[in-house]
């Protein structure tokens, strides 16, 4: 959530950025208008309170009942006016909160303006890892089904389209990737959390999925939701708390993730790229303002390191304003190479949120006797299903009907290859 005081101090700056973030600008204009009105009412209310206090102090100096009654009437009249101003201000507060809740975050100065993904900027490529940018026509879902690693048909029978069953060596490979990613991140100082996969709605508000993106979520009864990402329960671990942030809080978490994929239409109907339920290892940091950008850069390095260890060619992409998510100030996507599609596909979005989520989730810290909202960072490290797909395609030996396992993953998987049976 944005800071109303900062908006009112510089409305033109915020308006321009939010236009480029594809915000509903009519909400912003209304916010500025009623925000100013709210400020005037609050200022007038405080002024009247001060006047009441001043008059009350003079009460003991009065000698006659007539003077006292006259002052009482005057104070009563002012108090009534003050209460009216305060009540009007409180009524405006509800609307201000609604408007702030539905406006996206601003962006950092180095984020380029742009409408959509076509304006994103590739800032680095690592093309020579493993077998490099090979191309072929063997899709991961065909290879995986041929080797008996997955079962899409029976998953559909159980749960409908966009679900998968990992089985045999496929289940083992998914588990190996999970353990490898968790262990590697833990070695870098992240603390592991295994949270609930069901959360209360206010937690989704805290991280910015609600109220704007409810259609993308799986809603249960009693205001409960399946998590779309570990970002939600892990960031909200400190919801409505004041914590010590002399050092960043660093967490890593494996979870199943659940998304309705509303609006995805016919995109990626087959395979592991876009599912209703998928596996992901997430890294989350909660920091003070001074450490925010530095820790964001470290988080990008940590997620990238996993792709390098797995020998997967990838590129780093700086998202433009129009493609940056609702809550994010800056996002770097890590995109891995898929030979059958002859293109890069996202496997991680590492985002810096400033105090946007901290303000919504009321996560605070003290510094020099003042209280501030925490800054947050998160990103996948990594999306297991998409890494699974890339590993199969990149390491498939069609001549010998083998899938080779990257060297760093062998201790977790227990073998250097998967043979077709």
From Swiss-Prot:
Coiled coil: none annotated. It catalyses: tRNA(Ser) + L-serine + ATP = L-seryl-tRNA(Ser) + AMP + diphosphate + H(+); tRNA(Sec) + L-serine + ATP = L-seryl-tRNA(Sec) + AMP + diphosphate + H(+). ATP binds at residues 259-261, 346-349. One of its GO terms (biological process) is seryl-tRNA aminoacylation. It is found in: Cytoplasm. Pfam families: Seryl_tRNA_N (PF02403), tRNA-synt_2b (PF00587). Keywords: Aminoacyl-tRNA synthetase, ATP-binding, Cytoplasm, Ligase, Nucleotide-binding, Protein biosynthesis. It is an enzyme of class 6 (ligase). L-serine binds at residues 229-231, 282, 380. The keyword Aminoacyl-tRNA synthetase applies. GO terms for molecular function: ATP binding; serine-tRNA ligase activity. Its EC number is 6.1.1.11. GO terms for cellular component: cytoplasm. Consists of two distinct domains, a catalytic core and a N-terminal extension that is involved in tRNA binding. Catalyzes the attachment of serine to tRNA(Ser). Is also able to aminoacylate tRNA(Sec) with serine, to form the misacylated tRNA L-seryl-tRNA(Sec), which will be further converted into selenocysteinyl-tRNA(Sec). Belongs to the class-II aminoacyl-tRNA synthetase family. Type-1 seryl-tRNA synthetase subfamily. Homodimer. The tRNA molecule binds across the dimer. This is Serine--tRNA ligase. It comes from Mycoplasmopsis pulmonis (strain UAB CTIP) (Mycoplasma pulmonis). The gene is serS.
